[in-house]
């Protein structure tokens, strides 16, 4: 089991699928991190502008705004926020775009929880 540090890291999670949002929140909560979860990209960005999260985990396929668009807006309003992209489809072109735009990691939904937590921890460790 991956153990995440107990240091305070502000994590924002954005996914339009409430079941994924809930499961991912629980997973991060289970290792001691608090997550602010959002289903709406605009609300996510409003809060990010004032709270400047350390880490954002963003779904790519959403109805109102793609995760890539959210990532672009987030870079402008909170340039220090590290981004992890999460998606249901593994599209190499989208993966390249996300990584070229500064994503620290890219995961496919359904990834084994230990692998996901290790990626989140590595990203969080790179903040300091």
Describe these PLM feature segments.
Residues 37-55:
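Acidic, metal-coordinating helix/loop segments flanking the phosphotransfer/catalytic sites
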Residues 62:
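Receiver (REC) domain active-site loop signature in two-component systems and cognate sites
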């Amino acid at each position: 089991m991956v153990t995440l540090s107990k240091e305070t890291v502000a994590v924002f999670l954005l996914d339009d699928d409430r079941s994924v949002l809930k499961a991912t929140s629980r997973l991060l909560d289970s290792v001691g991190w608090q997550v602010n979860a959002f289903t709406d990209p605009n609300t996510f960005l409003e809060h990010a502008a004032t709270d400047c999260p350390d880490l954002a985990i963003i779904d790519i396929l959403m109805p109102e705004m793609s995760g890539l668009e959210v990532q672009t807006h987030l870079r402008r309003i909170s340039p220090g926020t590290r981004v992890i992209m999460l998606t249901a489809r593994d599209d190499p072109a989208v993966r390249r775009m996300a990584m070229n735009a500064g994503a620290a990691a890219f995961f496919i939904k359904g990834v084994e929880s230990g692998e996901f937590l290790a990626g989140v921890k590595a990203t969080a460790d790179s903040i300091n």
